[in-house]
Amino acid sequence: MELGTFIEQICRYDRQEYFECYGQIEERLHNLEKILGTLEESQRSMILEQMEHQAGEAPVWMRIHLLSFCMKVSRTPAYTQELLQTVLDADWSEVGEYEKLSDYWQIGTAVFADARLKGERTQEQLAALYRMLFDAFCGALGIRGRNYVPAEERDGNLVFVMTSQVLGQNHAPTKTLLDRCLVLKKYLGKKVVIINTAMQISGKGAGPFYDLCEAGYLPELCNLDHIEFQGEVFEFHQCANDMPNLDTMVQLVQMIRERKPCYLLDIGGSDICADICGMFVPEITVGTVFSAVAMSCGEYQLLDGKPGNGDLPVLERLGVDAEKIAAARFTFVFKPQEHHYTRQELGIWEHGFVLMIVGWRLDWEIADDFLAMLDRIAAQRENVQVVFMGRYESWQSIQTGYERLWKHTRYLGKQEDALAVFACGDLYVNPRRAGGGSSVAEALYQGLPAVTLPEGDVSAAAGEAFRVRDYEQMEREILRYMDDAGYYSRQSARARERAKELLDSRKSFGEAIGKLEEKIKDGSVALSISCFDT
């Protein structure tokens, strides 16, 4: 069946028929994606434009499905922005609150995984959609404005810490959560209550969306009433895996109003449940994508640096006062090193110069321009080895397009002891992407210099000393590290010093929170808080 005929056929389906055939439709789209991957760019674009045109005649919920396919396959921001606008403009009667929330998470997750999907207006559109959803859920709960528990009634020693997902200690956001709770309790003397709202990538009421992703959820945590971390014990609650649930939200609001914490700390953002609770006590949001403001309607935020020009329209859409954004360096906590590997044990060249490329979304984050740069280096230096660690399922495709690079490639897959592996490397090399901050911090700790473009979490964590302008400069910088032992030694020392700063949560987070607490107490609006030089 030709594509045009296929689209015409499914456009005649009502919702029930569409969902009955949903698995077959997804399978057909997956096969189409494989075919498109073999075509020239011009042919691929023409077919996607045909699909986009036909989608314009479909019901809006179906149009979202087809545009999501175009977005993920094209890897261009134009389809992202069209898809977001379609969701924003969709009437509530056709695409309801739960379905729009699912779309918000699916699009946001795709953009985070593949930086090529992000356009100039993408973050602003996501913020507008998030604010729309926040207002809708507030309306459903009868909340019409902030109604804080009076300051004199709030318990100055009690803090509620909310997050949308709690997994194991290999999960960087969970480590961030526990590290911040440790500082609050051990160094600031707070009693801490952790609540997993389970709002991450909500699947409740999800509509058709291509290659739908799901969040991890550990049901066994529902049986726990406390969590232990580095010798400290924290009260713990986990919501059932049916969020957003209005009854659960009401129960959490009641808990806030009864126990009256001095404030609420939201780790991660994009959590409507936390933001609703933040209508009753002050809320401070700490994003885990720390190089940009978090998607949160909470009154206050901590950001790694000052809001940039691109952040201001996002804050405006969210209804957040830019003067209430406080600066604090984002810090990390590592899983302790348990092993001491040799290069031979890892299959790494004993006398090679090892480039480490690390991440859980490398299939989306690694693009041809990055591979071409590595291929040029492989052509110039016989002793270079490129080691991929994490998840890169398509790594073997390197051999068809980059034969020189392929001969210098090693794929380690998932590693439980990242610090032990980094100890066998020489240089951390970062592709263009949003995330990766935790892995570069681990590399710096082991004395590996980094080389990164001036964008995303890796750039924010590594700092100015390790940034390059573009991939051409990255190529020259890598060669310099290989050829200039003195330069490498100096940069390695700077890497270790930077890592010390990135591990000092007590100073960075603790001092910023302490100052922010004073601002909340006296009701000040303007925040000129900075715990480092930007």
Describe each region flagged by the PLM.
Residues 2-57, 62, 67-70, 95-219:
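N-terminal subdomain of nucleotide-sugar transferases
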Residues 117-128, 280-337:
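Active-site-proximal region of nucleotide-activated glycan assembly enzymes
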Residues 171-183, 309, 320-405, 411:
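Conserved catalytic-core segment of nucleotide-activated headgroup transferases in glycan assembly
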Residues 242-246, 392-395, 409-422, 435-436:
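Conserved active-site histidine-acidic residue motif and adjacent donor-binding/catalytic loop
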Residues 250-254, 414-426, 445:
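Short acidic alpha-helix that forms the nucleotide-activated donor recognition element
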Residues 259-263, 423-435, 448:
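Acidic donor-binding loop of glycosyltransferase active sites
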Residues 313, 322, 431-485, 489-500:
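Catalytic binding pocket for nucleotide-activated donors in carbohydrate/polymer assembly enzymes
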Residues 340, 346, 483-527:
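A charged, aromatic-enriched C-terminal amphipathic alpha-helix characteristic of glycosyltransferases
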